[in-house]
Amino acid sequence: MIDYRGWRHTFKLDPDKTIDDEALEAICESGTDAIIVGGTYGVTYDNTLELMSRLRRYAVPAVLEISSLDAVVPGFDSYLIPLVLNAGDPDWIFAPHVSGLQAFGAYIHWDEIITEGYIIANPEAGVAQLTKARPIADATQAKAYAQVATNICRLPIVYMEYSGTYGDPTIVKAAKTGAGEAHLFYGGGIRNPEQAAEMAAIADTVVVGNVIYDDLDAALATVKAVKGTQY
């Protein structure tokens, strides 16, 4: 199994977005700890396979965060399986996982599977709309959701997902407290090294995504910012 507990920084690439070879090389050779592949809309088998085949040129670990059963591609180093803890649509908590096991259970290498408890904190995000995510009312509730993930569901990762907007450090700190021994990922809205460093002081792993496609230099600068931050 991939040792995600050593990750401080990861980039997240969306198969439905375009990235040229030069930019991809810069991302993969940046010193980031891993590349996560995943997205909410437009993720297909073909575009996931195409991105995976390009990533295989590099030594950096590549993991697939599964959001669609139609886009499960073999060949990644590991697979992240999200459970959306605050999904308002209960079908997004366990129903996709049951369907996935019915379809692929005989082929799964369980040592390649890592489960995540997602807390979606941006109600305007596409993933929030898709799952009808319940808003996070305050820090106390964020902590409680994280406690559900680690103490009730026994999930190894808690993922605070702000998806496109920069998060409230108070909320993220509360989730970190609630996560206990679980590993806290933070993702959402990081546009510069300063924001990356602020979240790196709280979370175990900082995930940088959209800025890759808007400002590559700023994205690359987040690696040093995160890895130079104590937490």
Swiss-Prot record:
Gene3D superfamilies: FMN-linked oxidoreductases. The keyword Magnesium applies. Keywords: Lipid biosynthesis, Lipid metabolism, Magnesium, Metal-binding, Phospholipid biosynthesis, Phospholipid metabolism, Transferase. It comes from the Bacteria. Pathway: Membrane lipid metabolism; glycerophospholipid metabolism. It catalyses: sn-glycerol 1-phosphate + all-trans-heptaprenyl diphosphate = 3-heptaprenyl-sn-glycero-1-phosphate + diphosphate. Sn-glycerol 1-phosphate binds at K12, Y159, M160, E161, Y162, S163, G164, G189, G209, N210. Mg(2+) binds at D14, T40. One of its GO terms (molecular function) is heptaprenylglyceryl phosphate synthase activity. Transmembrane segments: none annotated. Its EC number is 2.5.1.n9. One of its GO terms (biological process) is glycerophospholipid biosynthetic process. InterPro entries: GGGP/HepGP_synthase_I, GGGP/HepGP_synthase_sf, GGGP_HepGP_synthase. Pfam families: PcrB. The keyword Lipid biosynthesis applies. Its cofactor is Mg(2+). Homodimer. Belongs to the GGGP/HepGP synthase family. Group I subfamily. Prenyltransferase that catalyzes in vivo the transfer of the heptaprenyl moiety of heptaprenyl pyrophosphate (HepPP; 35 carbon atoms) to the C3 hydroxyl of sn-glycerol-1-phosphate (G1P), producing heptaprenylglyceryl phosphate (HepGP). This reaction is an ether-bond-formation step in the biosynthesis of archaea-type G1P-based membrane lipids found in Bacillales. This is Heptaprenylglyceryl phosphate synthase. It comes from Brevibacillus brevis (strain 47 / JCM 6285 / NBRC 100599).
